[in-house]
Amino acid sequence: MGVEALGRYSTNYRMNRVFRPDRAALVVPIDHGLVWGRVKQLEAPVTVMKRFLKEDVTGFMVSTGIVKASEVELAASPQMARILAIDAFWPTSAPDTGTGTLVASVEDAVRMGVDCVKLLLPWNVNDVEKVQYCKRIGTVVSEASKWHMPVMAEPVFLAAPRSPEIIEAELEVARVAYD
């Protein structure tokens, strides 16, 4: 099956599933197992998802395993968008460093029928890693355009307290993610 058969939905169609007509979205993140390991409140992600199906949310941020595990529930709630986390990040013991990798591809996302792919953009890492993350995002954006798949960059400061300095720095990384 070629790109045309699998990529039958346009980017605008997918974006309109994620965002309401007023361009607002409320997405429930339940993809943190890839980065944070076991999170007590998220140990049963499909159960968490079920709690929100009748609420005023537009969709869920999920991992590949959650996409597969929630197919029945989301088939019964087709209005819910799915944003697939296609990368993961693990902090290392060295200050200002970590390691990240892709764990799924844009083609995987298309085959799973999700509406958007999401990558992390850790900003409290060294400059070399920032460049690597931006390069990875650029590569994914290029691949996603072939499949008409929207891409979300999630700017994050990992393991950083919510100080005024971090909040100010988040404005910078949010602008980088937007651009």
Feature names for model-found ranges:
Residues 2-21:
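N-terminal basic/disordered segments at the start of proteins
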Residues 20, 25-29, 33-77, 81-91, ...:
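Alpha/beta enzyme core
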